[in-house]
Amino acid sequence: YWIGPIGLAENESEGTDFHAVKNGYVSITPIQTDMTAYHSMTALQQWLDKE
């Protein structure tokens, strides 16, 4: 899964993800994307409380 552009050849220096992939390795980067709509939490809680 990619979040952004693949990158250019100048980014393939040793120690980078691109270098690892180019040399047949798997590169795993732990990423956490928080897409919670915090601005909607109060309205959602009020809606749930009505149930």
UniProtKB/Swiss-Prot annotation:
Cytoplasm listed as a keyword: yes
Domain of life: Bacteria
EC number: 3.1.3.5
Molecular function GO terms recorded: 5'-nucleotidase activity; metal ion binding; nucleotide binding
Presence of the UniProt keyword Nucleotide-binding in the record: yes
Subcellular location: Cytoplasm
Any one cellular-component term (Gene Ontology): cytoplasm
Catalytic activity from the UniProt record: a ribonucleoside 5'-phosphate + H2O = a ribonucleoside + phosphate
Listed SUPFAM superfamilies: SurE-like
InterPro entries (alphabetical): SurE-like_sf
Cofactors that this protein relies on: a divalent metal cation
Cofactor note: Binds 1 divalent metal cation per subunit.
Keywords linked to the UniProt accession: Cytoplasm, Hydrolase, Metal-binding, Nucleotide-binding
Family: Belongs to the SurE nucleotidase family.
Function: Nucleotidase that shows phosphatase activity on nucleoside 5'-monophosphates.
The protein's name: 5'-nucleotidase SurE
Source species of the chain: Histophilus somni (Haemophilus somnus)
Name of the encoding gene: surE
